[in-house]
Amino acid sequence: MTQVQKIHPTAVIDPQAELAPDVEVGAFTVIGPNVRIDSGTRIGHHTVVEGYTTLGRDNQIGHFASVGGRPQDMKYRDEPTRLIVGDRNTIREFTTIHTGTAQDVGITSIGDDNWIMAYVHIAHDCRIGNHTVFSSNAQIAGHVEVGDWAILGGMSGVHQFVRIGAHAMLGGASALVQDVPPFVIAASDKGGNKAAPHGVNVVGLQRRGFSAEQIAGLRQAYKLLYKSDLSFDQAQAEIAAQVAQTEDAPSREALRTFADFIAATKRGIVR
């Protein structure tokens, strides 16, 4: 199949756009002048890729998606901010992903091997890691950080500047306004949709190959933070001591990830 056969004749591609020879573009798709698309990427029909957007290798972009649009920020003044997407991501139908703003670092970034389902919104300046899952209709506001292997349930909403740690899970239809530590499940409680902590993501960690010793250590740290009478500062001190006393290197590293994350919180952790 030639390059001409892979680009539908109704697609509108700016002459300045840079597409690898094997990129596939569906019918009525529009690609702007400052877009770069690497090898193996396939873009469905009726899709818009615009702005200063870079798509890596072997991405799959669904029909009617809007990728690289202007940020929904009233302070935006047409600065040349960017969207950078890595490799092997799946971005399904009607998803919207916006470029960054000058008030942050000017970049919205998405790593590799992410699974982004239909109707997801990823706002300006978000930083998405690798191997994440965004279920349909998950909506994240500006400046949100999502760590590797995190999962966001369908119809969940995330407040701006919130951080979701690696291997964390946010339940469906949950509203999240504070940080979720790594390895923790947060989901809506009875009588409302505000997310609250619901233990360590044991099943997810087992699937990722975490050992029983690693999981036991994380459950102990979770109990210190959430199930004790300790203040936040006291719990941090106890978890730091737990890190120092843990001899198993993988367990110590997981605990350090947990401890460093909660120490860096600015919005507070989910309660």
UniProtKB/Swiss-Prot annotation:
- Gene3D superfamilies, A to Z: Hexapeptide repeat proteins, Udp N-acetylglucosamine O-acyltransferase, C-terminal domain
Q: Which reaction does it catalyse?
A: a (3R)-hydroxyacyl-[ACP] + UDP-N-acetyl-alpha-D-glucosamine = a UDP-3-O-[(3R)-3-hydroxyacyl]-N-acetyl-alpha-D-glucosamine + holo-[ACP]
**GO terms, biological process:** lipid A biosynthetic process
UniProt-listed Enzyme Commission number(s): 2.3.1.129
Q: In which pathway does it act?
A: Glycolipid biosynthesis; lipid IV(A) biosynthesis; lipid IV(A) from (3R)-3-hydroxytetradecanoyl-[acyl-carrier-protein] and UDP-N-acetyl-alpha-D-glucosamine: step 1/6
What are the GO MF terms of this UniProt record? Answer: acyl-[acyl-carrier-protein]-UDP-N-acetylglucosamine O-acyltransferase activity
> Where does this one sit in the cell?
Cytoplasm
Assembly, in brief, is: Homotrimer.
What the record says about family reads: Belongs to the transferase hexapeptide repeat family. LpxA subfamily.
Report the protein name in the record.
Acyl-[acyl-carrier-protein]--UDP-N-acetylglucosamine O-acyltransferase
State the organism's lineage: Bacteria, Pseudomonadati, Pseudomonadota, Betaproteobacteria, Burkholderiales
Identify the coding gene: lpxA
